[in-house]
Amino acid sequence: MYPLRAALLCVAVLSVPIARAQIPVDTVRSFMSFRVEEDSLEGALLSADHDITYVLSGVPGSFVYDFGAFAWPTAWSVNGLSPQVAQLYFGPIPFNDLLTGRPRYDLLPTALLRYPKIDPGLPGAVVGIQTELRTADTRKPHTQLHYQAGAHGLQRVTALHAQQTNRLFGLPGKFQGLFAYSGAAVAGDYPGSRLRRQRQLLLRTRYQQYTWSLELLYLHNQRRLGAHSGVLGAGEARYNRLIAQVSGESRTRRLVRNDFLSTLTTRFLIASVYLSTQSLYYEGVGAAARRLGATVQRNFRIGRHRLHVRGDAYTQRISSGVALPIGHSASSIEVQVRDSLQFKTGYLLAQGIMRQQNGDWAPGGRLRWESTLSSIRPYLELSHSAAPSPLTGWGEYLVDGMAESGSITQASGGVGLHMGRFSVQPYGFVANAQNAPDYREIIIDSVQVVSDTYTTFGAGIRLNIASEPERGLYATLNSAMTGTGETKLDAGCLFPEWFSSGRLGFKAVLFTGDLRLNASVRGRSWSAMISRALHAPTGLLVIPSAERTPVDASYALDLVVEGGIRTATVYIIYENITSGTRLMSGNELVPDYPLPAQQWRFGVYWPIAN
């Protein structure tokens, strides 16, 4: 614990304001100014999606284990790796579950986010996902309203208000405040899948002077969600909602999470301190945890070199519950140095990482080369990282096995060709996991910690036909073929051998710009696979047991119509339109959890400058 305390003390010392420092102009202006593309129809559509995994599905080599419903533990996998290796960040806060370690996409304030960025170099990450809040122009008071209604009694509302004052209590500088609230409820497609409560509260305030700024943020989440263990029966009977039954219909998962963040920004460094608390319970079994962490970042520029130095540390303790021993602790310290060397035609990025997790030190690194040669943009990336530590217990629902300290090495590359509105990018990847921790289902609702050694590989292509800024035809396609070498666990095909996703649409502007239309069809398809099973007590996606029914090859189509009326956006989404028809009885991506059939949603997104 002494190295961790020393690291936190260093953060506190570095957090002292530096006299006469000057914040770059871009930093000052970027705090609360809406980017144009974020206030467009595409930005509004991000608010309409269940979570950010729909956006992540466009990343080369990625696949989404989807449930098609709000608040369910949808998981994103890339390069054939376990979904648990992804490290999600909300600003500088690690946003994986404090207890189970899975990324909590469902707890993000989705309607208020910028588009996520993939960064394998984030602390603690094999694959990192960085998310940030959208910002609002507060020179005038600003309000956003977002309402959704849909099938199975869906009701969802999000409201945001932000404003600014140049003086408060006689103090110089700018005070900027933001308040947002979100609530949702839905009956669910099957018994035992009801979202009984979803509440979210976001508060952010910022005090800014010319030389420095201090920001405080608070995010609160509550969830109470049905947690059945799968639809019973075999064949087409499982897709008949009138007669289908589920296992564990009355069971629920309950969660409360609070995140507090303080960030000091100067010209020389950015220092953040955060406190996260969380409780998670399933049928009386659960625990509560508290995590205290800090981050310090500094950028340098030496000639063509752009250096970025970052230090992260946290300590965590189980404060109550029966799923894990009270007082059980975990800690992490990580130091990174990143150098980006600029060339006339591209750049070379090198990153070195040293990480201590629960007392064990492990090195890591990343190397990326990217170039622009006329209309050709090749890239190549290599990375090596320690595998994340597994959950060590969850009462009777998890058996602690022998999990060794593992590592994961990845290589990917591709070539982008851009010709006017058309672009094409063939790509390939290979990943090798050595003794990577995972979870294997023994029987339904009971899993064991295991470690696996395997190699995955694949190749794919991305096509894009861009529309004009506000009108015309557009199309996107992301298709890949994958394979897995011999595995120590002989787990079978957890990832489809081929899968694709795409969108075809048309934009139009009518009545001299007062009405903007965007109509499209979204689709995805996948091959037969064993897939990953849902462990209902924790929400983890695990290697399934023989009791699970394999997933058949199938597809899903969605119809999306958006209309921009002055500043407001109205949209209708009709999801999985062929399921439950003569074309197909049903489909699923996670064994025994069919995707909702012919599910519609209606929404209104309305930013107001008041």
Regions found by a protein language model. Give the residues of each.
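Transmembrane beta-strands of outer-membrane beta-barrel pores
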Residues: 120, 147-151, 183-187, 209, ...
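Short strand-turn segments of transmembrane beta-barrel domains in outer membranes
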Residues: 128-166, 189-191
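Short loop/turn motifs that connect adjacent beta-strands in outer-membrane beta-barrel proteins
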Residues: 136-141, 166-175, 208-211, 264-272, ...
